[in-house]
């Protein structure tokens, strides 16, 4: 890894030599999902299709393939997060991008590669559907997804679906859905793009994209990336390799065939948090670690394969069609005390496998006054899971639709939608409505409500249920389908120098399956293995203010979320409030050859319930934690970062970040301390071959 980064640094130096003047540069400080206006009045361009400033080359015109049908089509309120909105910002993975989105929070475990839980609306593992190009990419038996495995540089746009409609689009009826759309249009010449960064503890990231037209109708692309970090604490190292391939073929102006393949391989050491000899604050000395447990001897291996064949067609007038065939397989190997070196640590050697074959068909019919969107999904999954001591099969068939009335003025656009889901032999449903529109050219609104049922997953069906509280271990009941109600209302405003959004949501889930830890042996004296599930009711409501302001060459961005429900009502651990913001100075220097952006990033996080994770199953446990540790509420925290980036000729961006400038010692997840003050630098460089 060090040799690779040394070579990359040589490449960075050559950027300064070969840079050429470019008069039209892009400001990418637009807040994700909300339009800002920079007083510099520059155009927003995609760095992969930008024209050469010295010549107007026809070869730079992109190949125009049929675009992917967005889930939020004909939606004038919820905006996509475009890649060029964050490509020059400071991010390691998509969790850093989501930080500035309404009701979003990352349960950060403090080190690169650790399986952080990304939360939306106070919901995380088991409640969020990640949809890539129309296909659910969640682990089918865990019903979760680790964002470290996604290739960030292939993203074209992201849509965070309102909580009222999250159940609608995939094979799982999860309350929250995030749709990630890949890029399809590229310049008609070969391109190479490099992004890398390096930081303390030998943390490094290298990503290379190569894309080339073979003919006017055929494009091929290849992406390879490597991420790694050495152990900051004993047994906390991580390395990941990703390989992605893409083929786009234009059968005609009205029909395309797109094939994509994604592979990832991860090796992750699970160190279990900080032991007492690393803690400087005596308040944490109640965490009892024995000397023999300093190295937990836990690690996780993952291999993931995903292939997707997509046919996009505009053959029938007024109808856009999307037919996808997909295959997903995941191999997870979980090891704990494999060699039985420690008598007081249970030996766990589990191989958990699954594979899924499926198809998805979508028709979007659009006329002048009406839009009708229909989606049908079918998939079959086979499981071989040592952790559940179970080999089984799961079939899912879903049919959903949305009917929307369109008007010329866009002042009032009502819609109704519904879904039927035959999930492994059980029929569940969901339906709702929404109204959106524009009050004038500067203000728009949204209102949505829904009722839907959520499935019981393969994992939940293989655990005992104890529905009473306090838990009666003699009373066992079958898992119940949870009943969910959701509402969301928002106002968006957009003026010359001020823009923002105010959003309120209310969510209720009855009979929700919640994991419980109870009298379970473990490796670190922190209970981190699920014993059974219990039924709980979840009540959550909150308000978000996403506010942006431009003054001279200063840009202000703030994302404030506040939850009205108590910590116990929310059930899952999440902060009472969060504030994430940026203050940047931007300017063009050196005859517009350098675009400078510099300032601060800050995050204020309120306290939350104590909790632990079962990493093998991707479950958060807040109830019945071990009595051997005196758990208290996770305290509030504040982190301040310094950030500076310079974009040269719109071809290369060099960035430097000083993280945790105040060198604050804190944690978000007990007891995974965040990194101390560290320096991180890198470059993103676009080449034309």
Regions flagged by a language model, labelled:
Residues 27-28, 38-39, 46-47, 52-53, ...:
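Coil residues (strongly favoring Ser/Thr
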Residues 31-89:
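N-terminal periplasmic "start-of-domain" segments of outer-membrane beta-barrel proteins
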Residues 57-59, 66-70, 95-136:
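Extracytoplasmic beta-strand/coil segments of soluble accessory domains associated
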Residues 105, 135-162:
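Short acidic/polar hinge/loop motifs at secondary-structure boundaries
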Residues 143, 305-333, 352-689:
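Exposed, low-structure sequence patches enriched in small/polar residues
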Residues 149-195, 205:
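A beta-strand signature from Gram-negative outer-membrane beta-barrel systems
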Residues 204-228, 235-268, 298-315:
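Transmembrane beta-barrel wall of Gram-negative outer-membrane proteins
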Residues 256-309, 313-314, 329-355, 396, ...:
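Flexible loop and strand-edge segments within Gram-negative outer membrane beta-barrel domains
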């Amino acid at each position: 890894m060090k040799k690779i980064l040394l070579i990359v640094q040589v490449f960075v130096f050559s950027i300064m030599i070969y840079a050429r003047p470019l008069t039209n540069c892009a400001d990418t400080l637009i807040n994700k999902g909300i339009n800002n206006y920079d007083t510099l009045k520059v155009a927003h361009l995609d760095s992969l299709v930008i024209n050469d400033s010295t010549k107007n080359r026809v070869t730079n015109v992109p190949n125009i393939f049929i675009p992917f049908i967005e889930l939020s089509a004909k939606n004038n309120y919820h905006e996509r997060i475009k890649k060029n909105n964050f490509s020059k910002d400071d991010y390691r993975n998509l969790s850093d991008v989501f930080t500035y989105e309404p009701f979003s929070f990352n349960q950060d475990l403090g080190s690169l590669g650790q399986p952080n839980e990304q939360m939306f609306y106070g919901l995380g593992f088991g409640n969020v559907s990640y949809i890539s190009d129309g296909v659910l990419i969640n682990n089918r038996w865990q019903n979760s997804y680790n964002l470290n495995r996604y290739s960030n540089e292939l993203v074209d746009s992201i849509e965070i679906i309102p909580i009222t409609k999250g159940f609608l689009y995939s094979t799982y009826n999860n309350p929250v859905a995030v749709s990630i759309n890949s890029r399809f249009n590229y310049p008609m010449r070969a391109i190479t793009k490099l992004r890398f960064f390096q930081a303390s503890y030998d943390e490094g990231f290298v990503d290379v994209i190569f894309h080339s037209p073979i003919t006017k109708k055929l494009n091929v692309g290849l992406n390879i990336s490597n991420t790694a970090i050495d152990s900051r604490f004993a047994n906390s190292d991580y390395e990941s390799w990703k390989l992605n391939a893409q083929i786009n073929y234009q059968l005609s102006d009205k029909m395309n065939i797109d094939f994509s393949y994604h592979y990832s391989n991860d090796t992750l050491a699970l160190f279990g948090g900080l032991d007492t000899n690393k803690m400087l604050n005596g308040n944490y000395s109640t965490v009892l670690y024995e000397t023999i447990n300093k190295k937990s001897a836990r690690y996780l291996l993952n291999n993931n394969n995903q292939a997707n064949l997509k046919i996009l067609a505009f053959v029938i007038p007024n109808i856009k069609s999307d037919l996808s065939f997909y295959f997903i397989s995941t191999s997870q190997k979980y090891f704990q005390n494999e060699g039985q070196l420690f008598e007081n640590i249970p030996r766990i050697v589990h191989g958990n496998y699954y594979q899924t074959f499926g198809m998805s068909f979508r028709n979007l019919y659009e006329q002048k006054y009406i839009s009708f969107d229909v989606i049908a999904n079918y998939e079959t999954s086979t499981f071989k899971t040592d952790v559940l001591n179970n080999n089984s099969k799961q079939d899912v068939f879903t049919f959903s639709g949305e009917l929307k009335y369109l008007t010329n003025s866009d002042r009032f656009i009502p819609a109704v939608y519904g879904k039927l889901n035959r999930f492994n032999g059980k029929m569940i449903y969901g339906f709702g409505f929404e109204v959106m529109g524009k009050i004038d050219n500067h203000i728009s609104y949204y209102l949505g409500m829904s009722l839907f049922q959520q499935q019981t997953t393969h994992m939940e069906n293989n655990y005992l249920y104890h529905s009473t509280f306090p838990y009666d271990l003699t009373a066992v009941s079958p898992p119940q389908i949870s009943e969910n109600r959701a509402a969301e209302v928002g106002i968006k405003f957009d003026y010359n120098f001020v823009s923002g959004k105010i959003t309120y949501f209310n969510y209720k889930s009855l009979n929700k399956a919640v994991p419980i830890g109870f009298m379970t042996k473990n490796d670190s004296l922190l209970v981190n293995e699920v014993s059974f599930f219990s039924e709980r009711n979840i009540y959550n409501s909150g308000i978000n203010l996403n506010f942006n302001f431009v003054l001279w060459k200063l840009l202000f961005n703030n994302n404030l979320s506040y939850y009205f429900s108590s910590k116990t009502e929310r059930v899952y651990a999440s902060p009472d409030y969060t504030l994430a913001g940026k203050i940047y100075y931007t300017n063009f220097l050196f005859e517009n050859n350098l675009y400078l952006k510099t300032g601060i990033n800050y995050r204020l996080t309120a306290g939350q319930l104590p909790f632990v994770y079962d990493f093998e199953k991707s479950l958060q446990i807040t109830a019945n934690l071990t009595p051997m540790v005196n758990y208290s509420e996770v305290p509030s925290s504040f982190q301040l970062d310094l950030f500076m980036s310079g974009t040269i000729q719109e071809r290369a961006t060099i960035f430097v970040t000083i993280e945790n400038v105040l060198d604050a010692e804190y944690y978000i997840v007990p007891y995974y301390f965040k990194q101390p003050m560290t320096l991180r630098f890198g470059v993103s460089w676009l080449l034309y071959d």
